[in-house]
Amino acid sequence: MKMDSLIKELNLLWEPVRPFLVTQIEELYGRQDGHILEIGPFGGLIFALARKNVGKSFSIAAFPQAAIALYRQDARKHGLEDRVRIIETNSSLTGIVDESVDLTIFRGALFFPAIFQVDFKAIYRVLRKAGIAFVGGGFGKYTPAEVISQIRKRSEQLNDTLGRARVTIESVRDQLRSSHLEGCCEIITEGGLWVVMRK
């Protein structure tokens, strides 16, 4: 399968998880305003946030190339092509203005080094003061077991085909240390492996 087909299937498969992950993100963010940025190919959470009116403006930092057309299709499907701006970029967030984002979401960030490397410094750079980033992966703490069980096997197959790496808490800590950002980040393991970054 081509990468765009794999990404498309994985994002469709995860649609039932989105409302539950969004609940966790809403809880962390604690606001209804601000600019929200979703990063990378494994997304769609931004559409759920926009429909719930969590945030005032919305952008997607779309990469790799295979993900860009998929996001445009998704925006049309959800009737949000006028509200969600799709920016062609890379994992260093080239073209995203410094200190312009209040909430950043990057699902799948830690697990696909064959496709991209997570750039924690870039994520910190684009956050406004008091901004928050939710970076990592997993089903989230509110997704019911029955929803997880329906998609787990196929999700694992697709992730493995895309080159998912096994990541430890210590390896994530090492990345944060090397980025000199460990002081503003918390690693949480409830519902996956996530880094919560606060500026």
Outline where the language-model segments fall.
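Conserved class I S-adenosyl-L-methionine
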Residues: 134-159
